[in-house]
Amino acid sequence: MLLALDAGNSNITIGAFEGSDLVCQWRLRTVHDQTADEWGILLRNLFSPAGLDIRRVDGIIISSVVPPIDSTLAFMTQRYFHTNAMFVGPHTDIGLEIRYDNPNEVGADRLVNGVAGFYKYGGPCVVVDMGTTINFDCISAAGEYLGGSIAVGIGISINALFSKTARLPKVDFRRPKNVIGTNTVASIQSGLYYGAIGMIDGILERVISQLGPETKAIATGGQAHMIVEGSRYLKTYDEHLTLQGLQMIWERNHPEAPQSE
């Protein structure tokens, strides 16, 4: 069994794979000062309720954009899973040629999304990952990671609006019934929702004009399913894209690993 961890700024998403099949998924908060023992006990306690045997974990792959917790996660995997985790980085064999000016600057999650987008949907493609930031990752038809855009995330926008104004309430992100809000909450939700869509569609329009009209646009991440409902360019929502990309990279680097039928 493969354990795949995507450590982001706000959450850590964890997936258990049997071959290429995702059999269970969990989401935990990213806690910078959590110890290896706390992480290990927390992860081990997830398995039994899911009906999984932790002793069957024989591989762990991690993509992380949170350097302060990398060494803690590495030690945790050694102590509690008796294996050395594979960390995805710019020198990992991911099956894409990285065309970024400085490959060391590319977040591991962006590379992983590029792999999953290209090998699941073909190129050219652009993956839009909506997390703490909104990342646009572009892959050519030849399988080259070209780069993309990084924009402010929806959660950051909500927090900034709430913290920098005296009378505006903090609201949940949701699709409003109408673009014209008839109360303060509805007006804020309209601005957040259609503002995000306008930004995303504006960037995608320019990306598609550069990569070509055959470009596939794939959405993943927290609020992506709501954005797809209103976007002109995003028609595909893939909830597990990042975890599947991690599994693909593991499989590429461990061809001897058993595959699902």
UniProtKB/Swiss-Prot annotation:
Pathway: Cofactor biosynthesis; coenzyme A biosynthesis; CoA from (R)-pantothenate: step 1/5. ATP binds at D6, A7, G8, N9, S10, N11, I12, T13, T132. InterPro entries: ATPase_NBD (IPR043129), Type_III_PanK (IPR004619). The keyword Metal-binding applies. Its cofactor is NH4(+); K(+). K(+) binds at D129. Substrate binds at Y100, G107, A108, D109, R110, T184. Transmembrane segments: none annotated. Gene3D superfamilies: 3.30.420.40. GO terms for molecular function: ATP binding; metal ion binding; pantothenate kinase activity. Its main location: cytoplasm. A monovalent cation. Ammonium or potassium. Its EC number is 2.7.1.33. Keywords: ATP-binding, Coenzyme A biosynthesis, Cytoplasm, Kinase, Metal-binding, Nucleotide-binding, Potassium, Transferase. It is found in: Cytoplasm. Catalyzes the phosphorylation of pantothenate (Pan), the first step in CoA biosynthesis. PANTHER family: TYPE III PANTOTHENATE KINASE (PTHR34265:SF1). HAMAP family: Pantothen_kinase_3 (MF_01274). This is Type III pantothenate kinase. It comes from Solibacter usitatus (strain Ellin6076). The lineage of its organism: Bacteria, Pseudomonadati, Acidobacteriota, Terriglobia, Bryobacterales.
